[in-house]
Swiss-Prot record:
The keyword Signal does not apply. It comes from Ajellomyces capsulatus (strain NAm1 / WU24). Its EC number is 3.6.4.13. PROSITE patterns: HELICASE_ATP_BIND_1, HELICASE_CTER, Q_MOTIF. ATP binds at residues 103-110. CDD domains: DEADc_DDX39, SF2_C_DEAD. Coiled coil: none annotated. A motif (DECD box) lies at residues 212-215. Belongs to the DEAD box helicase family. DECD subfamily. It holds the Pfam family Helicase_C. Residues 293-438 form the Helicase C-terminal domain. Keywords: ATP-binding, Helicase, Hydrolase, mRNA processing, mRNA splicing, mRNA transport, Nucleotide-binding, Nucleus, RNA-binding, Spliceosome, Transport. This is ATP-dependent RNA helicase SUB2.
Length: 442
């Protein structure tokens, strides 16, 4: 394979593979009954042992006994109190225990593995110690930025991100010098597998192996194959951590095959849609009425930033063009634009230079832009889990938000029924008089 050749890139269509319906929280790895704490289920070998700290709600990050440099960075970021998932996972994870964690969008899962791995890391020049994999380029880029944010007082820590759609030669050049060789690698499975296979990236010193949005990678056969090959290139005694907002009963045993007696953490009952502070509505209308209704909503609603989801790259481009012609400050992010342009647009939106983003499901998972407080499903997704990930872009980390879904076909009505059944909610119709902005504006 030539180094310049673009490798496997997982497109929007592949991301639409329907997730299996999730059930209630599983029992522990040893078959022990799970330990329930409110809406938090904890199980696994460490859950009931003294000294594991599980269930002790720390009042601050200092209680985790993290490195001083990390605590300084956390303070700089303005974080005061850990989220529920951080309180449960971090004290056990820093003891080198494997972790399988499912928690809804916006609860701070990324910080769990970023802080844990940075705390444990002792950088050695020319050695990669931490490997983090995710299923899209945008998420890889964002995770790399999180590492940069929290390692600002750790000057010896080098982080690199590798994904398909960019020239492989650049990656090889970075890996060929001890001065630039990263101690932390973040990337997508296709590109990482190629670098390992071509012996450009060595994984023999890996101490932590992390999968973010693990169900998406282990659900799809070709991605799972890449993950397995990469896993086999790492040492047997590493720590394995996996995270996702949705973990079906079918996927959990697959995850646990990579692990040794993991701590299992499932926040909130799987069947409940609990995005706290997020108002959700639907609007019934014909396909031809969507543009007019969207225009009305963007004109009448107050919002900081809005993300509008559509079902294809072509529709994303067309809707973005239409919005710009109507003088709305819009941008489109989907797999139909070049990687360089995609990252540029993502940064433009994240830095608040644009307030409206039209996107496909490639933007539906894990992307964390705190100013988004309105999500519109111009096209309803194909399944309930995709709906959860999409609307979770608004109302991140406990803030308020508003989600509106257009329902225009019989198939949409079926998906709406599935959402209501899956999450045991009854989504109301959008009120004719609109919604008071104080209900969703922080």
């Amino acid at each position: 394979m030539s180094h310049e050749e673009d490798l496997i890139d997982y497109s929007d269509e592949e991301l639409q593979a329907t997730d299996a319906a999730a059930g209630t929280a599983a029992a522990g790895a040893n078959g022990a009954a799970p330990k329930k704490e409110g809406d938090l289920t904890v199980s696994g070998a460490r859950a009931d042992k003294k000294g594991s700290y599980v269930g002790i709600h720390s009042t601050g990050f200092r209680d985790f006994l993290l490195k001083g440099e990390l605590l300084r960075a956390i303070t700089d970021c303005g974080f005061e109190h850990p989220s529920e998932v951080q309180q449960v996972c971090i004290p056990t994870a820093i003891l080198n225990v494997d972790v399988l964690c499912q928690a809804k969008s916006g609860l701070g899962k990324t910080a769990v593995f970023v802080l844990t791995t940075l705390h444990q890391l002792e950088p050695v020049p020319g050695e990669c110690s931490i490997l983090v994999m995710c299923h899209t380029r945008e998420l890889a880029y964002q995770i790399k930025n999180e590492y940069a944010r929290f390692s600002k007082y750790l000057p010896d820590v080098k982080t690199a991100v590798f994904y398909g759609g960019t020239p492989m030669q650049k990656d090889i050049e970075l890996l060929s010098s001890k001065d630039t060789y990263p101690s932390i690698v973040v990337g997508t499975p296709g590109r990482l597998n190629a670098l390992v296979r071509d012996k450009k990236l060595s994984l023999r010193n890996i101490k932590a192996f992390v999968l973010d949005e693990c169900d998406k990678m282990l659900d799809q056969i070709d991605m799972r194959r890449d993950v397995q090959e990469i896993f086999r290139a790492t040492p047997a005694d590493k720590q394995v951590m996996m995270f996702s907002a949705t973990l079906s009963q079918e996927v959990r045993p697959i995850c646990k095959k990579f692990m040794r007696n993991p701590l299992e953490v499932y926040v909130d009952d799987d069947t409940k849609l609990t995005l706290h502070g997020l108002l959700q509505y639907y609007i019934k209308l014909g396909e031809s009425e969507k543009n007019r209704k969207l225009n009305e909503l963007l004109d009448s609603l107050e919002f900081n930033q809005v993300i509008i989801f559509v079902k294809s790259t072509q529709r994303a481009s067309e809707l973005d063009k239409l919005l710009r012609e109507c003088n709305f400050p819009s941008i489109a992010v989907h797999s139909g634009v070049s990687q360089e342009e995609r990252i540029k647009r993502y940064k433009e939106f994240k830095e608040f230079n644009k307030r409206i983003c039209v996107a496909t499901d490639v933007f539906g998972r894990g992307i964390d832009i705190e100013r988004i407080n309105l999500a519109i499903n111009y096209d309803l997704p194909a399944d309930a889990d995709s709906y959860l990930h999409r609307v979770g872009r608004a109302g991140r980390f406990g803030t308020k938000g508003l989600a509106i879904s257009f329902v225009s076909s019989e198939q949409d009505q079926e998906v709406l029924k599935d959402i209501e059944k899956r999450f045991e909610v009854a989504l109301p119709e959008y009120p004719q008089g609109g919604v008071d902005s104080s209900a969703y504006m922080a």
